Amino acid sequence: NVGKSSLINALVNHKNLAKTSGRPGKTQLINHFLINNEWYLVDLPGFGYAKVPKTIRAEFHDMISQYLLNRTNLMCLFVLIDVRHKPQSIDQEFMHWLAEKTIPFVMIFTKADKLGKVELAKNIGSYKVEMKKTWEELPEIFVTSAEKKTGTTEIVNLIESLNPQFKEII
């Protein structure tokens, strides 16, 4: 469980906007949240591990792929990664797919409060080393804790910087 819903709630300073669960795969639909009557934050089902049958996971994959490929006003996708884990091939493959399809994205490491500073730096470094094997330039990286609201200001600043661009394309 990477903590997507918890991060959404922390970003918009609303405890129960997105339903949270300790169970991976809780988000099974595309949920649109209109924020301040100005912009949408969209919560997609997780692309990776979920405690659901393989057929449902395949449906998630197709639904997410179609959404991302056909969403012309998508300004930036947030790829959330639980910083406690070593680089996962599914995350790497997904980010390569995004790059191939020219879908703009940033990496957001979640649950930073669960690690000490040394282990946190080591785990992020492992991702960077792995990605530099095939990437010329790494995507922008954010390090967050929804519980402590670490990194949320930086993400909100990114969203605000994208909003003028969003208004131009709608």
Language-model features, listed with the residues they occupy:
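Canonical P-loop GTPase G-domain recognition
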Residues: 114-170
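Conserved nucleotide-sensing/catalytic segment adjacent to the nucleotide-binding pocket
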Residues: 35-75
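Conserved G1/Walker A P-loop phosphate-binding module
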Residues: 1-51, 161-170
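Conserved nucleotide-binding/hydrolysis micro-motifs of P-loop NTPases
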Residues: 26, 39, 46-48, 84-86, ...
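Amphipathic alpha-helical transducer elements in NTP-driven molecular machines
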Residues: 27, 57-61, 92, 149-152
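Conserved C-terminal guanine-recognition region of P-loop GTPase G domains, centered on the G4
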Residues: 62-139
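Short, glycine/charged-enriched secondary-structure capping and boundary segments
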Residues: 11, 54-57, 92-96, 121-124, ...
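Short, flexible loop segments at the rims of nucleotide/cofactor-binding pockets, characterized by
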Residues: 17-19, 53-57, 82-86
